[in-house]
Amino acid sequence: MASAGGGGSESAAPEADRPQPRPFLIGVSGGTASGKSTVCEKIMELLGQNEVDRRQRKLVILSQDCFYKVLTAEQKAKALKGQYNFDHPDAFDNDLMHKTLKNIVEGKTVEVPTYDFVTHSRLPETTVVYPADVVLFEGILVFYTQEIRDMFHLRLFVDTDSDVRLSRRVLRDVQRGRDLEQILTQYTAFVKPAFEEFCLPTKKYADVIIPRGVDNMVAINLIVQHIQDILNGDLCKRHRGGPNGRNHKRTFPEPGDHPGVLATGKRSHLESSSRPH
């Protein structure tokens, strides 16, 4: 009798005693102006519209740009002249990035730094990010460091023609009031070489490569369907691996990791001021 009673109390355990939800973490990489953030927004939009389990999932987009290092006075002076390399791996605070993503994966509330490219400084204000069902983390070098790369449940690489990326970047920066000569000098001196040396080689780590970015709706729809299957606990899809047929090296979140408590239907998008990528 005592054993039966104990079992009944366990089934009635309060919500606070149950395991905390763990987000489905997606890494999205690609060159500057490849359309990474646009792809993230489209995935977020489609996941929000397609009511999985008759509810909206809470979705968050984070940018690697938030984790730029605090610059010294000398580095700031170079940045103002377009002479600082924001595309180099050493430009990022990888320790803080790893710690933040680790806490996100563990279902914890985190504070994400805010980086201002107008003043080239990390602002005192931070953005609080609460546990979410799906977190998309985008940036040019999100696959560069193995300890960060291995945290993603799904890795996407947005593959866009270099001429298209350059034209987008020039148009975007000119609209922000930057000098055309400085834009092109920075691109040839830092952006293009860094892409070829640091970003492009990480393409091999992607589970899915998306040619043409958001214009490739066939690929994006397949990715969204795959994410929905994973979140719904479709074991067949989980064991087969990603949409490209390759098995993942990591374990996807368990079916019970996404309880209804997070089903707020709210969507968040964190983006740094005047982001370079």
From Swiss-Prot:
Enzyme Commission code: 2.7.1.48
CDD domains for this protein: UMPK
Stretches with biased composition (Basic and acidic residues): 268-277
Keywords annotated in UniProt: ATP-binding, Kinase, Nucleotide-binding, Phosphoprotein, Transferase
Pfam families hit by this protein: PRK
TM region(s), chain numbering: none
Gene Ontology MF term list: ATP binding; cytidine kinase activity; uridine kinase activity
Pathway(s) served: Pyrimidine metabolism; CTP biosynthesis via salvage pathway; CTP from cytidine: step 1/3; Pyrimidine metabolism; UMP biosynthesis via salvage pathway; UMP from uridine: step 1/1
Compositional bias (Basic residues): 238-250
Region (Disordered): 1-30, 238-277
Binding site residues for substrate: D87, Y115, H120, R169, R178, Q186
UniProt catalytic activity: uridine + ATP = UMP + ADP + H(+); cytidine + ATP = CMP + ADP + H(+)
InterPro entries: P-loop_NTPase, PRK/URK, Uridine_kinase-like
Family: Belongs to the uridine kinase family.
Its job: Phosphorylates uridine and cytidine to uridine monophosphate and cytidine monophosphate. Does not phosphorylate deoxyribonucleosides or purine ribonucleosides. Can use ATP or GTP as a phosphate donor.
Protein name as catalogued: Uridine-cytidine kinase 1
Organism expressing this protein natively: Mus musculus
